[in-house]
A protein has these predicted regions:
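Intrinsically disordered, low-complexity terminal tails
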Residues: 1-22, 133-135, 163-202
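Polar/acidic, low-complexity leader/linker segments enriched in S/T/G and N/D
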Residues: 1-59, 175
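Short amphipathic beta-strand and strand-loop transition segments with alternating hydrophobic
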Residues: 6-13, 76-87, 128
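Intrinsic-disorder/low-complexity regions
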Residues: 17, 64, 73, 85, ...
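Short, surface-exposed beta-strand/loop "edge" segments at domain boundaries and coil↔beta transitions
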Residues: 26-37, 54, 70-74, 101-107, ...
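Extended Gly/Ser/Thr-rich low-complexity repeat segments
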Residues: 36-49, 55-63, 105-125
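A broadly used, surface-exposed interaction patch
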Residues: 54-92, 96
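Residue microenvironments linked to proteolytic maturation
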Residues: 83-174
Length: 202
């Protein structure tokens, strides 16, 4: 088993309300997708291991986003950040933080949904296809620009996953506030629309 990993070190802040740890499988390498990703012109795709490893640095610090129906991408709904990525066997795994205070609906969805229901989908730019005439496109180079959280059944790869980190789930259960605890006013989020076009593939 080969393992390649990269991580961005962030200082620990115990009980930070806007850092909700997550983990997931973003995609599989050296395996064809189960369905064509959007932007692939009806072709299934293979992300080569070499391309995935070369692109790992571009994944650090990228955002995770979601669409209200949990069925696609919306780059303007950036609800978290990726701080670690590794390729183990054929899985590209990621972890990071959801912005739980800013996007409580995302955290609520993760807690209330069935286990194994959610998946992930990468977003890329500057993708190079080995043979555009091939039935299955082989990606030999790409730059990661983000990732989406969506229903696993909607993802191009059925074996992706997304869940809150187990440690956080245990801590959350042990420190739940009483129902009569005063609530703080939420701060308003301000989004800056992305410029340029990217290939956001499921």
């Amino acid at each position: 088993m080969r393992l390649e990993a990269l991580a961005v070190a962030l200082p620990e802040v115990t009980g930070h309300p806007n850092r909700v740890p997550f983990e997931g499988v973003l995609t599989l390498v050296d395996e064809p997708s189960n369905r064509p990703p959007s932007g692939a012109r009806g072709h299934r795709v293979i992300l080569t291991r070499e391309a995935a490893l070369a692109a790992l640095p571009s994944l650090m610090g990228m955002a995770v986003d979601y669409a209200p129906g949990w069925d696609g991408h919306d780059a303007r709904r950036k609800c978290g950040i990726i701080t670690r990525a590794d390729v183990e066997a054929n899985r590209l795994r990621v972890s990071g933080y959801l912005f739980g205070k800013d996007f409580p609906e995302v955290e609520d969805r993760m807690r209330s949904g069935k286990a194994g229901m959610m998946g992930m989908s990468y977003e890329i730019a500057d993708a190079h296809v080995e043979d555009m005439n091939a039935e299955i496109w082989k990606l030999t180079r790409a730059t990661f620009t983000g990732a989406a959280i969506l229903l696993r059944e909607k993802a191009a790869y059925r074996n992706t996953s997304f869940q809150l980190a187990a440690k956080h789930c245990r801590e959350f259960a042990s420190r739940r506030a009483p129902a009569d605890r005063p609530r703080r006013l939420n701060e308003r989020n301000i989004f800056q629309p992305e410029k340029g076009k990217e290939a956001r593939w499921k």
